[in-house]
Amino acid sequence: MISGIINLKKEAGMTSHDAVFKLRKILKEKKIGHGGTLDPDVIGVLPIAVGKATRVLEYMTEAGKVYEGQITLGFSTTTEDASGELLQWTPVDETLSVELIDQAMTCFMGQITQVPPMYSAVKVNGKKLYEYARAGQEVERPQRQVRIYDFKRTSDLVFEDECCHFDFRVSCSKGTYIRTLAVDLGQKLGYASHMSFLKRTASAGLDLSQALTLAEIAEKVEEKDFSFLLPIEYGVLDLPRIDLNPKQTKEVSFGRRLKLLRQEELLAAFFENQLVAVLEKRDTSYKPKKVFL
């Protein structure tokens, strides 16, 4: 059975589930999962775990993300992105300055509250929000706390047809809706807005510049080249690391707790650069949560 992490470049027009389904066929392996959903129209890094590496999938899902995209001021859509229908139109004054936009973007730094868009997979009363939206129903949506580490404009403003668009880059915690961030920024500036393009450039320590498409992976498998499979250690890149000595490693292999002078809730424990376990803080000690020996 093959095992490892794949840095997949998801292309537009497919869901994250579609990507997993196709990889199962390519690799002839059922035990495959992804570490963080991407909307169908969004391209970019989709972390994939295969075989035994699926045991670290939850830590990849929890990791921070980096996105690059484009925000359009002037009109909003039903889906908060370019795929939706026109919802509201507010012509943009060409006197709008980059200074005003940059200042508004700083207001979203740190911990913020978001309300998920109606066209999302968040469940309310056992039903996904997009199911309500498709039925023409709007329901009360639960607020969520997310964290924005960096949010910056990366291009000049382009004024066209009484609209304005510009590129941006954002680094954020899991669960952040970039579509909603684009809409909220527009509201801050006094304009209807939407996210007109998005790609995920980094997730769980994996970078888009080194990601492979499904076609590229299929070609390598055909050639019996499995070098694209990264070690399971890549699945815990976002966890704080601790290097154990031989005695500690033996204790962990038996499932015993360790006394460690650390404060983090979770630790990725290594011995000689090999992942030994994920340790979880319990009172004054650390208990092996998952052992990989």
Curated annotation (Swiss-Prot):
Protein name: tRNA pseudouridine synthase B
A Gene Ontology molecular function term of the record: RNA binding
PANTHER family: PSEUDOURIDYLATE SYNTHASE TRUB1, TRNA-PSEUDOURIDINE SYNTHASE
Gene Ontology annotations of biological process type: mRNA pseudouridine synthesis; tRNA pseudouridine synthesis
HAMAP family named among the record's database cross-references: TruB_bact
Name of the gene encoding the protein in the UniProt record: truB
EC code(s) of this entry: 5.4.99.25
Record Pfam families: TruB_C_2, TruB_N
InterPro entries: PsdUridine_synth_cat_dom_sf, PsdUridine_synth_N, tRNA_psdUridine_synth_TruB, TruB_C
Signal peptide boundaries: none
Keywords, alphabetical: Isomerase, tRNA processing
